[in-house]
Amino acid sequence: METVVIVAIGVLATIFLASFAALVLVCRQRYCRPRDLLQRYDSKPIVDLIGAMETQSEPSELELDDVVITNPHIEAILENEDWIEDASGLMSHCIAILKICHTLTEKLVAMTMGSGAKMKTSASVSDIIVVAKRISPRVDDVVKSMYPPLDPKLLDARTTALLLSVSHLVLVTRNACHLTGGLDWIDQSLSAAEEHLEVLREAALASEPDKGLPGPEGFLQEQSAI
């Protein structure tokens, strides 16, 4: 009889431990996934393009298939449904800016790789490398600022810094690759990002304490003092 009881207790304990382990696994996948993606993003080396440009003597020898200017997990970060549960309404604008910057950067890299023979000098290539190195940390900063508690002013500052870095990459790429006509899509993309950035900027201003005219309570206090 005692053996049966011991076996039954053992079975129940095993079931309990298995259920607990499954619960921990589910909670980990549900709540820790965004940060896991961010950690992967942090651990990914900077762009293969930069390494290739620093080792190749001729830009035209670079292989476009080997170029990854941004982390391959950024798509998973942008498509993560956890961002949807946002009461502030700011996350959609942050996601839009990240997507625009990601797409712009990828296309600029492709244009750079396809214009190797048109490069002015090796100094132009170096300029692109320097500017490209600044983009990944900016993306990292924006993603980190998207986790609660949200700070509209921090979101505004970091998305602005990211957009400035991408705009700088546009300028140096245009100059280095002699890009002229048929590039309206670049200006349109930057304008679209600016519209989203304006929403974040307004939210940042709204989050600041009003230092202007006194409110009704202050006005009544002033009147009573008089």
Swiss-Prot record:
Its localization reads: Cell membrane; Secreted; Secreted, Extracellular exosome; Endoplasmic reticulum membrane
- Name of the molecule in the record: Transmembrane protein 98
- Spell out which residues lie on the membrane's Extracellular side: 25-226
Which GO BP terms sit in this record?
A: negative regulation of myelination; negative regulation of oligodendrocyte differentiation; negative regulation of protein localization to nucleus; negative regulation of protein processing; T-helper 1 cell differentiation
Tell me the segments the record calls region Required for interaction with MYRF. Answer: 1-88
Q: Which of the residues are on side Cytoplasmic?
A: 1-3
Tissue note: Widely expressed with high expression in the ovary, pancreas and prostate. Expressed in the eye, particularly in corneal endothelium, iris, ciliary body, sclera, optic nerve, optic nerve head, and retina. Expressed by activated peripheral blood mononuclear cells.
Provide the membrane topology annotation.
Answer: Single-pass type II membrane protein
Paired cysteines (S-S): none
Record bears the keyword Transmembrane helix:
yes
Q: Which Gene3D superfamilies match?
A: I/LWEQ domain (1.20.1410.10)
Functional note: Functions as a negative regulator of MYRF in oligodendrocyte differentiation and myelination. Interacts with the C-terminal of MYRF inhibiting MYRF self-cleavage and N-fragment nuclear translocation. The secreted form promotes differentiation of T helper 1 cells (Th1).
List membrane-spanning regions.
Answer: 4-24
Question: Mind naming one GO cellular-component term on file for this protein?
Answer: plasma membrane
Q: Which disease is it linked to?
A: Nanophthalmos 4: A rare disorder of eye development characterized by extreme hyperopia (farsightedness) and small functional eyes. The cornea and lens are normal in size and shape. Hyperopia occurs because insufficient growth along the visual axis places these lensing components too close to the retina. Nanophthalmic eyes show considerable thickening of both the choroidal vascular bed and scleral coat, which provide nutritive and structural support for the retina.
Tell me the protein family, please: Belongs to the TMEM98 family.
Q: How does it assemble?
A: Interacts (via N-terminal region) with MYRF; the interaction inhibits MYRF self-cleavage.
Q: Where are the annotated segments for Disordered? A: 207-226
